[in-house]
Structures are given as C-alpha cells and as structure tokens.
Amino acid sequence: MARKQQFDYNEDAIQVLEGLEAVRKRPGMYIGSTDARGLHHLVYEIVDNSVDEVLAGHGDHIIVKIHKDNSISVQDRGRGMPTGMHKLGKPTPEVILTVLHAGGKFGQGGYKTSGGLHGVGASVVNALSEWLTVTIERDGFVYQQRFENGGKPVTSLEKIGKTKKTGTLTHFKPDPTMFSTTTYNFETLSERLRESAFLLKGLKIELIDERNDQREVFYYENGIEAFVAYLNEEKDVLSEVVSFEGEHHSIEVDFAFQFNDGYSENILSFVNNVRTKDGGTHESGAKTAMTRAFNEYARKVALLKEKDKNLEGTDIREGLSAIISVRIPEELLQFEGQTKGKLGTSEARSAVDAIVSEQLAYFLEENRDTATLLVKKAIKASQAREAARKAREEARSGKKRKKSEATLSGKLTPAGSRNPAKNELYLVEGDSAGGSAKQGRDRRFQAVLPLRGKVINTEKAKLADIFKNEEINTIIHAIGGGVGADFSIDDINYDKIIIMTDADTDGAHIQVLLLTFFYRYMKPLIEHGKVFIALPPLYKVSKGSGKKEIIEYAWSDEEMGDVLKKVGKGYTIQRYKGLGEMNADQLWETTMNPESRTLVRVKIDDAARVERRVTTLMGDKVEPRRKWIEKNVAFGLDEESNILENENLSVAEEV
C-alpha cells in the first residue's frame, strides 16, 4: 500500500489538549490496566508513534530493546521529533512528553492517517515511568532531554552532538510503584511487533532482549499476504493466499485471504494499523462483497441452479482466514462505543465492498478450479447447516423434545430463577464433585451440570461427530444459545459459564477441551466475558476439633505461608487433589460463593496468537505441537504450576 507524505511535521503541527496530572491517579483509563497488559501497552504506544512515521513515508526500520534492567528503548529512523520552541514556551519534545494529547496526530497535523487511535502516546508513557530519556537526531544535530519521577523534566533539551541521520530514540523504565509487574515478556512483545510488521510491507522491526541475548527480526515483503500464511501455517490449506488492494474515495484498502479445511472463520481487521477487535463497517463490506461474488459465480457456472437458494455468508466463510487493513483519513474516522474496537465509518463499507467485489469476481473467473472447489465446499457447509437446523427444529417442535429433555433431565440440576442475567452454570468434572456442588450451591441462581464422559476434541473432529458427543450435546442444550454460525448470545440461559475441575493435569485437560469447543463454536461467549474457570483451593489448614476447629484455605504456596502464621502452631495441612475431597459446605465457601470465591475470566487478547495456539496444541498435526512443547515447556520434578502464577492475569473485584 502506498505511503504518502502530505503534511509538515513541525512545531505548529503539535496541538495540545489537556494536562498530565490525571494519568498517575487513574492509569487504567489511559493504558487499560496496571498489570502485565498495561506494562506492555507502554511499548506499543511508543512503537505506534514510530510506525506513524513509517506510514507517512519516513524511515523503514524500528529497533526495540529490552535492557537488562527491564527498561525499554525504541529507536526509529523517522524525521525526529521537532526540536524548536513550542508556542507554550517550552521545547516541543517537552510538550510532546509532558502534556497529555499533545501530538502531531490531533487536528490535521503531521499525519494524514495515524495509528495512535487511543491518542495517549508518549506523554502517558513518561507519566508512568521512573525515568525517560529522549534522544533526537534532526537538522544535523543530536538533542537529548531526561525526565524522572513520572515525567518531570530534570534537564532542558540539550544539543549533545552532530549527526547526518534523523530519528528518535525513546528510552524509559516503567515505575514499579505504578505496575504490579515490571518484567517484560519477549514473546508478548514479539507477537504484537510481528503484527505491526505484517501490516506495513517492507517495514523492518527488530526486537532485541539483552537479558538473555534473544533477537527476532520481523520483515515481510508481502505484508498481509504473509500474515494470512502465518495464521494458516499449521492448517491444511485449499488455496493460495489471494490479496487485493486499492483506493476508493481516499480510503486505502488491503485485503488478503486463504481457505483451509477447518470449519471456523478467522477474520482480523485493522484501521490505520490498529486492531479493531469488534470488526465494523470495513469487515461488513468485505463479507457482503464475498457473499455476492461467490453467489454470482456459482450461478454463472450452474453450481447453483435457479431453484436453489443463495449461499449464506457463513457457509462461504467456513474455513476462511482473512486480513482486512484499511487506512482512513482522520476527518472520516468514526468508532462505535468507547473502546474504539469497532469501526463506524460508513464510507469504509462501500470502499471495501467496491474493491473486494471487483477484484474477487475477476479472481474467481481466472481461477476456475479453485473457485469451483470453494463453492462446492460452501454448498456442503450449507447442507450441513440445513441438516443441523432441521434437527434443532424437530427438537423444539416436540418430535425429539423428549430425547433432548431426557439428555438434560438426568444430568442438569437447574437453577430456581428463570433470570438469565443472574444465573450461573457450573460445568463440573465427575459425578462425586457434581454431587457436592449440587448440595452446596445456591439453588436460586446456580445450575450444575456434571460431566461424566469424555469431552471430544472439537479442533480435530468433524461437525457431525461433535454433535454425536453426548457431553457436548448436553452443554449445547443447557446453554441454550445454539451453536456455530447460528449461536446467539442473546438467547443464552446463563450470565456465567463456570468450568470447575480438579487442580490436576486431567482437570486442566478437561478445561482445555471445553475452552476449545467454546472458542470454535460459541466464540461470542468468550468475547462477551461469559466463560470462567473456578479456582478451588490447593490446601486446607485446620487446627482443633469440634466447635473450636479453625479452618483456613490457601490457593497457592505463597498464600500458604500467611495462612500458617494466622492459624498458629498445632495445625494440620490437607493437600486437595480433587474436588470430591471437599464436602458441600467447603465447596460452597471456597469455590461457589460469589462473596469468597476466585474466578478466572477467559479472554481473547491477541486473536492471531490464540488462533495459532489452538491449532498447534489441539489440531491433528503432531510435529508443530512437539516443537512448541520442546521450546516452551520446562520438564522437571516440580509440582504442576498454579494458574494464579500466570503473569497475564489481571485482577478485578467480582460485581
């Protein structure tokens, strides 16, 4: 996609909106959270500024370093921050780094399209840093300024040398008093930086970890074509990667896709290089265009007869991996909702539709073998969906209702309330724990479904086999929102679906099988934050007996130390191996009572990463899984690790 330079980037292009004091008081408002996610977000803010320079046609190389002290430096070869005096009476870099919303992307400033959609930028990074140093190469000189203690300038902007280069180097150390962790994860950064490199053809991003001499270079000549190939790397594909690009009413569009033999679709969309996780008008434009083009082609070559209904979009997109990347000028940019996760610009729909329609119709004509294969696959998907719909309707109309009710009646213990907004469904491993859960639950709003048999691995199985699996069928009926393309979040019977298993490897396996099913066939459940993992305690510490007995619980070895101090000498420790070892009262108190339980909400943070992990770890190819395990799993004699030790967890109170 063409990069364009349209505006001057100088002191006058820097516009100021408000002061910086609020950031340290409410960091979550600016970076989302103060856990590992927020910590890594600081890096993305600085990198996105460098990417904006590349987008504007300046520089094509960014170097990100994790230093030994967990400080971060980001070096680009853009124009360098403007170094003159700003109209506020301070050097411009000081304004950029100390005033919130001061930057070249506000107003029609230094950038035509900018990725800093959240618009907080360098000043917020400075506010949340122990120290930050900016080094600028511009106009033949090297300039430097240092800030400490949350963005206070300790030097003015100083000339420290001469240079023939241009660019900006930002070096900062996150403030440990602001973050729950200040240790950077190489893998987390590399996934996001890889994404930035995919989206800009020819951009080279280097990630260097000085703590352990790791280094990765991301550079993709084919841009989003390489991104699609990366998503499908471990899948069996049915076509080459196809890509289209074009411009329509000043909106630039990049679209690439490839089909695999799986059953789910995976579309990732971006606006000005920033992910739109909830889709929007650009996604709808691409979907509409694909549906129209495939139907027109199918009729033209008589794969669909006159009497046949048109293929639905979901049938056509079965097995599709696609990337949509649009660049929209600031004056046209509109989002729905606060989080900017969904594009609202109506012009984007017609731009994407026009470009994809025209080029896809041409592609199908020119590649008849591939086109016919894909249309036949869609027809098969349509037939399977129709059969599933009939089966569901028969179940609803009563022909098979008795059977579906029987499937549930022996297993599901329903909640007393009929209010889906309050009700919770516990999926419990095994009958004995299921029995305790039924006795211990709050009958008003908690339903319990014990899982007796083996849950099928839905990543490997065909749709027909999945519906033959009794456990999966029972779960589908209990949740009540349908399944696959017909799933509707509005029809579900519960506000929380809670997976409760033993704290051992078998329990973890059941969790993963259920999560794979929800991810593939009820993804909106996860996207809307309805899926949770219950955390039963690992230890019970007791002292005394009868009415004087003191009982405390610990969820981790760390917590155990505090509990032992609290109980005092003469204690007895019990290590729980399974839920069945707890009686109903204990299970209620530790794992089911909303006042005292701990739940882990399942979220999708990085869609591309999740897609690849599910394919690698749950798919039918053994080799990629073996390689991943060799690279990422340390085998030892230690007890299995606790889920609470995962650095990607963020903590929130239950409401």
Swiss-Prot record:
Catalytic activity, EC: 5.6.2.2
Reactions catalysed according to its record: ATP-dependent breakage, passage and rejoining of double-stranded DNA
InterPro entries: DNA_gyrase_B_C, HATPase_C_sf, ParE_type2, Ribosomal_Su5_D2-typ_SF, Ribsml_uS5_D2-typ_fold_subgr, Topo_IIA, Topo_IIA-like_dom_sf, Topo_IIA_B
Compositional bias (Basic and acidic residues): 387-397
GO biological process terms, semicolon-separated: chromosome segregation; DNA topological change
Domain of life, source organism: Bacteria
Binding annotation for Mg(2+) 1: E429, D502
Binding site for ATP: Y9, N49, D76, G116, L117, H118, G119, V120, G121, A122, K340
Record's GO cellular component terms: chromosome
Domain Toprim: 423-537
Binding site for Mg(2+) 2: D502, D504
Protein name: DNA topoisomerase 4 subunit B
